[in-house]
From Swiss-Prot:
Record Gene3D superfamilies: 3.40.50.2300, 6.10.250.690, Winged helix-like DNA-binding domain superfamily/Winged helix DNA-binding domain
SUPFAM superfamilies the record matches: CheY-like
Post-translational modification as stated in the protein's UniProt record: Phosphorylated by CpxA.
Residue ranges constituting the Response regulatory domain according to the UniProt record: 3-115
Activation/inhibition comment: The two-component system is activated by envelope stress such as overexpression of some (misfolded) periplasmic proteins. Activated by spheroplasting (which removes the periplasm) in an autoregulatory cpxA-cpxR-dependent fashion. Cpx two-component system is activated at pH 8.0; in a degP deletion mutant activation is halved. The CpxA kinase activity is inhibited by periplasmic accessory protein CpxP; proteolysis of CpxP relieves inhibition.
UniProt keyword list: Activator, Cell adhesion, Cytoplasm, DNA-binding, Phosphoprotein, Stress response, Transcription, Transcription regulation, Two-component regulatory system
Species annotation: Escherichia coli (strain K12)
Protein name as it appears in the record: Transcriptional regulatory protein CpxR
Regions recorded as binding DNA: 131-230
KO phenotype (gene knockout): Loss of the Cpx envelope stress response. A double cpxR-cpxA mutant decreases transcription of degP. Cells are less sensitive to killing by nalidixic acid; double cpxR-srkA disruption mutants are as sensitive to killing as single srkA mutants, suggesting the SrkA protein kinase is partially regulated by CpxR. Hypersensitive to alkaline pH (greater than pH 8.8). Decreased numbers of stationary phase cells bind to hydrophobic surfaces, cellular adhesion has altered dynamic properties; no induction of cpxR when cells bind to hydrophobic surfaces.
Highest taxon in the source lineage: Bacteria
Quaternary context: Interacts with cognate sensor kinase CpxA.
Length: 232
């Protein structure tokens, strides 16, 4: 049973969400502020639902502290129209965001999509015949360990960032649409103002060292998508 840490200061909302998620088969632990969430966080937590506006330590500061020690998947719960919070959350390593008020089915679908990705990584680790290790320039992507390294040095990537990078490497030199990336990486259909994939690409550009061959890692083709640049 997957364990979810639900972090929100709205006690009525957390009570309703806890009941909903437990009916969907999840084990739910509740925290009402960021400090309490960090105290409860351990390796048994499979995913965090993290509200932005909270007392003591808000969601952004909590995410920043969390990412120093854990790569646990995080879905940020933001106020509708709060574009700055969404962008900042994604920059700091959130996997996805969901604006309030949200549809219960959409929340459950987002959770299941991210957990499927995490379970895929675990299966790769336990399967000698899983997806192959990929190499681009001095970058090595090992899906079994969900680990990226450059020139032998491990890169600190979130699970979502690794999945996105691996998918683009699988289609090296080919354009992959934002719609396909959103569906495969985040498990959701792309909406007109959804910038999650764009922000994850931006994070990868910031985290990846310069290539030895002098090429950029990615090209943006407006209206079409992204491609990972091949050496040729």
């Amino acid at each position: 049973m997957n364990k979810i840490l639900l972090v929100d200061d709205d006690r009525e909302l957390t009570s309703l969400l806890k009941e909903l998620l437990e009916m969907e088969g999840f084990n739910v632990i509740v925290a009402h502020d960021g400090e309490q969430a960090l105290d409860l966080l351990d390796d048994s937590i499979d995913l965090l639902l993290l509200d932005v506006m909270m007392p003591k330590k808000n969601g952004i500061d909590t995410l920043k502290a969390l990412r120093q020690t854990h790569q646990t998947p995080v879905i940020m719960l933001t106020a509708r129209g709060s574009e700055l919070d969404r962008v900042l959350g994604l920059e700091l390593g959130a996997d996805d965001y969901l604006p309030k008020p949200f549809n219960d089915r959409e929340l459950v679908a987002r959770i299941r999509a991210i957990l499927r990705r995490s379970h895929w990584s675990e299966q790769q680790q336990n399967n000698d015949n899983g997806s192959p290790t990929l190499e681009v320039d001095a970058l090595v992507l090992n899906p079994g360990r969900q680990e990226a390294s450059f020139d032998g040095q491990t890169l600190e990537l979130t699970g979502t960032e690794f999945t996105l990078l691996y998918l683009l490497a699988q289609h090296l030199g080919q354009v992959v649409s934002r719609e396909h990336l959103s569906q495969e990486v985040l498990g959701k259909r792309l909406t007109p103002f959804d910038r999650a994939i764009d922000m994850h690409i931006s994070n990868l550009r910031r985290k990846l060292p310069d290539r030895k061959d002098g090429h950029p890692w990615f090209k943006t083709l407006r209206g079409r998508g992204y491609l990972m640049v091949s050496a040729s």
